[in-house]
Every structure is written in C-alpha cells, then in structure tokens.
C-alpha cells in the first residue's frame, strides 16, 4: 500500500526497517514523473527492500550512502550488467581512513561478511581523501560503481581486477590497473602512529590478513561501490550514466 493509504487507514510503521523502506519509496517517487514514475515504481519494492536490509546488517553505514550504492547497482543490472551479482561492497570515502569504512554484504544470504579498513590513493589526501581522479598516473582514488572480474597474482600478491562502470568517475580503472589487493600499510597500528592509514596508488587496498577471503567473496561478477563527493547522481539511472567501454560495450 502507498503512504496515503496507510495514513487513511491508520496503519502504523512498527519497525526501523519499515520506516526506512517507506521513506526511501517516498523520496524516490518524488524524483520521477509520468512514464518514468510508472517504470520506477515497478522496481522500487525490491530496491527499497535491499536498502532496508543493508541498513539492518550495517547500522553504522549512513542511509544516503546505502541508497546511492543500491541505486547505482540496480541501474547497472537494468542494463544487463552484473545481473547475477549476489554480493555488494560499499566504501564511504568521506570517513577517515583511521576508521572502518568498507562493508561487504551478501545480499543473497542476508549477511554482513566484512566491516573493514580500506586505503585510498596517496595523492587523494591525508586521513580523509579530498581529491579523486579517473586519470592514468594520478595516484588518486576513483569513485563510483565497479564490477569485479578475475583474480591474479601480481606485485601486490593476490589481487582482484575491477571494471569501472560510472561514466566520468572510474571508466579508466582497467587502464589505471585499479585492483583490490592486500597491503601491510593497511593496519590500524600504522594509523594510530601516523594519524592515517598508509596509502595506495589509487587501489582499494585492504588488510593482508583478510585480503584473500574478501577477494574470493567478491570476485567474478559482483559489485563494489565507492562513495564520495559528487557521487549522489550515480543512483539516478539516466541516459549515459553508465560506461560499458571496459566490458566491450
């Protein structure tokens, strides 16, 4: 039932999950009109359910970041990309590197698999990254939605290839060799001494101890979403918002 019907019949929202779901549906319906409203309404229930689920599994994550990540993921899936994805990792780069700012969720099993530290690029900033880039050689973090590919063993050990799907944000990820890998500088002890984690050349590097299980959980067709300044538009599935260049599209 819609919000007006619920108000007229005196129904109440009993749980946090219900309140989040209804708030999200209401906010999304105000963004679209006409034919777009009909199409969006058909997809809203499942999308709102996933937003509510993630909010329950990862209560420390901000709701707007969850909405953004799920919206970007659903946009990609509506274009036939990652339609079989079961797992989603969300990184919030507005949070200091000294804090855990990466969540890996199994949407199929409805479980939080990891809540972890993650590094940003050395040219992006100190503790909280301020600069982001899609340029080769920038050594800055790229934001937006990524589709995971195969694993390989490289100079940083066991690593995961990433396709950048967000036009203007991360489409050069493969050319930049932006991958997920473990790194000894991703260590809370380092952060305590230096006031920040060690930094990468733009890769979302994680702790060595959890790199392999995290990579194995995310490899081959799942999603990673990196939130930061200016990414709010990525939840809106507009024409040209998705780049499939690195996928051969």
What positions do the PLM features span?
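N-terminal secretory signal peptides that target proteins for export/translocation
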Residues: 1-28
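N-terminal leader/targeting segments and the immediately adjacent pre-domain N-terminus
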Residues: 5, 41-47, 53
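N-terminal targeting leaders of exported, membrane, and organelle-targeted proteins
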Residues: 12-16, 33, 45-47
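Bacterial N-terminal signal peptides
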Residues: 27, 31-43
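Cell wall/extracellular polymer interaction/catalysis modules
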Residues: 48-201, 209-249
């Amino acid at each position: 039932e819609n919000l007006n019907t619920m108000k007229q019949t005196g129904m109440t929202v009993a749980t946090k999950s219900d309140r989040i779901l209804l708030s999200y549906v209401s906010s999304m319906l105000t963004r679209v009109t006409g034919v777009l409203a009909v199409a969006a309404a058909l997809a809203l229930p499942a999308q709102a359910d996933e937003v509510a689920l993630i909010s329950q599994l990862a209560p420390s994550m901000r709701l707007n970041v969850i909405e953004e990540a799920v919206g970007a993921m659903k946009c990609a899936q509506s274009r036939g990309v990652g339609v079989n994805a079961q797992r989603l990792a969300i990184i919030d780069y507005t949070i200091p590197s000294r804090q855990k700012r990466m969540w890996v969720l199994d949407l199929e099993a409805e479980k939080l698999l990891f809540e972890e530290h993650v590094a940003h690029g050395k040219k992006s900033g100190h503790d909280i990254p301020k600069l982001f880039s899609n340029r080769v050689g920038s050594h800055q973090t790229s934001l937006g939605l990524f589709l995971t590919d195969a694993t390989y063993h490289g100079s940083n050990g066991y690593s995961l290839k990433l396709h950048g799907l967000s036009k203007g944000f991360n489409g050069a990820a493969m050319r930049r060799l932006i991958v997920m890998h473990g790194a000894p500088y991703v260590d809370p002890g380092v952060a305590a001494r230096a006031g920040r984690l060690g930094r990468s050349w733009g890769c979302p590097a994680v702790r060595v101890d959890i790199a392999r299980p995290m990579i194995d959980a995310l490899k081959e067709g799942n999603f990673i979403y990196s939130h930061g300044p200016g990414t709010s538009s990525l939840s809106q599935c507009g024409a040209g918002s998705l780049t499939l260049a690195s996928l051969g599209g």
